[in-house]
């Protein structure tokens, strides 16, 4: 897995394949988070059994590098998060995938089913869980504010049709968004994990605490 990690962005390509069906060398948010979980798990094993081994540090920082690569890619589209909170228009959604080597957008707003709330929720959930495990993922107040905005972004998943884990909308492949239980469940888990969570980990300061409003 780590042999495929981009040395600059920290992102992982979904595949090395470029064929008639498309270019799969892009970095999907969902694929990246799920892929790096194995590295995170191995880093926790080293932390417990061989904390002084160099691999304990390398594995941990490889996870940080990927998660921050995704964070930076999303923060470049922070204007879309603000727009979506007001419009709930799928065209205002954060992109579902980015260029592996730059973290920049690779397809237009209307060229992909970008509104995949399970992927965004998974990212938010793992920020909480990885931070709780001892990783330092969030560095500044700008980043805290953005994660707080992501919480608002996913808060209406229970009533929001999206393209979900299937990416193509409803199951007959017509590209029509629908409410997906996989998205609803992941959003619920993310909101529960983030409620009152301090992104600055062991800091006694309250500035890094994420708030979930009652309606969320």
Predicted regions and their residues:
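Acidic, mature catalytic/reactive cores of soluble proteins
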Residues: 1-216
């Amino acid at each position: 897995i780590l042999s495929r990690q981009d040395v600059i962005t920290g992102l992982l390509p979904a595949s090395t394949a470029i064929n008639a069906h498309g270019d799969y060398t892009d970095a999907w948010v969902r694929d990246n988070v799920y892929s790096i979980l194995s590295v995170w798990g191995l880093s926790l094993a080293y932390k417990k059994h061989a904390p002084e081994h160099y691999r304990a540090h390398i594995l941990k920082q490889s996870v940080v590098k990927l998660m921050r690569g995704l964070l930076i890619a999303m923060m470049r589209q922070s204007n879309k998060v603000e727009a979506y909170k007001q419009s709930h228009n799928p065209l205002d959604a954060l992109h579902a995938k980015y260029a592996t080597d730059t973290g920049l957008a690779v397809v237009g707003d209307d060229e992909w089913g970008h509104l995949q709330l399970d992927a965004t929720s998974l990212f938010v959930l793992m920020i909480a869980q990885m931070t709780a495990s001892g990783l330092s993922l969030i560095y500044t107040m700008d980043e805290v504010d953005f994660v707080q905005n992501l919480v608002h972004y996913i808060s209406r998943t229970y009533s929001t049709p999206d393209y979900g884990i299937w990416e193509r909308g409803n199951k007959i492949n017509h590209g029509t968004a629908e409410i997906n239980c996989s998205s609803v469940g992941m959003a619920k888990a993310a909101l529960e994990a983030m409620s009152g969570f301090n992104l600055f980990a062991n800091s006694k300061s309250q500035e890094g605490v994420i708030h979930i409003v009652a309606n969320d």
